[in-house]
Amino acid sequence: MVKVGMPKVGIIMGSDSDLPVMKEAAKVLEDFEVDYEMKVISAHRTPERLHEYARTAEERGIEVIIAGAGGAAHLPGVLAALTMIPVIGVPIKSKALNGLDSLLSIVQMPPGIPVATVGIDGAKNAALLALEILSIKYPEIKEKLKKYREDMKRKVEEKSKKLEELGWRKYLEG
């Protein structure tokens, strides 16, 4: 996204192989017209860069960080340790344990260093959670979130009505 103003959300991933998952967070933020920055920063391979990112995030206007990582998945926890900005961890599905290793690495933080954690490959929900955090300060985001939820409700009600009218067999056929 072209940065119009200062970014509000940082989307960080440990590897470019995480991009197919993490792009879903970017899509949501774009739909809500919220500025973001997206970077690949490895907690293990580029620790100095990660420290610099965390140290300067607030002065760059970052208010929430979404951090996706697979495997050992230390990125979200290290970021949370280095900054007071809320960090939302996205466990990325791995080959070895289908993302369970990532989930447990992110969710099991020591007391005093919390990381909000979404489901495996849950970048879309991470972005929605980031928007909810921002909506405390930005009423225009809160209004867009209300509309988003109303639209979801309407779609479910439409599907239910269609199912009731057609029956399950015809519903599944078309």
UniProtKB/Swiss-Prot annotation:
Pfam families: AIRC (PF00731). Pathway: Purine metabolism; IMP biosynthesis via de novo pathway; 5-amino-1-(5-phospho-D-ribosyl)imidazole-4-carboxylate from 5-amino-1-(5-phospho-D-ribosyl)imidazole (N5-CAIR route): step 2/2. GO terms for molecular function: 5-(carboxyamino)imidazole ribonucleotide mutase activity. Keywords: Isomerase, Purine biosynthesis. It comes from the Archaea. Disulfide bonds: none annotated. Its EC number is 5.4.99.18. Substrate binds at S15, D18, R45. It catalyses: 5-carboxyamino-1-(5-phospho-D-ribosyl)imidazole + H(+) = 5-amino-1-(5-phospho-D-ribosyl)imidazole-4-carboxylate. GO terms for biological process: 'de novo' IMP biosynthetic process. SMART domains: AIRC (SM01001). The keyword Transferase does not apply. HAMAP family: PurE_classI. Catalyzes the conversion of N5-carboxyaminoimidazole ribonucleotide (N5-CAIR) to 4-carboxy-5-aminoimidazole ribonucleotide (CAIR). Belongs to the AIR carboxylase family. Class I subfamily. This is N5-carboxyaminoimidazole ribonucleotide mutase. It comes from Pyrococcus abyssi (strain GE5 / Orsay).
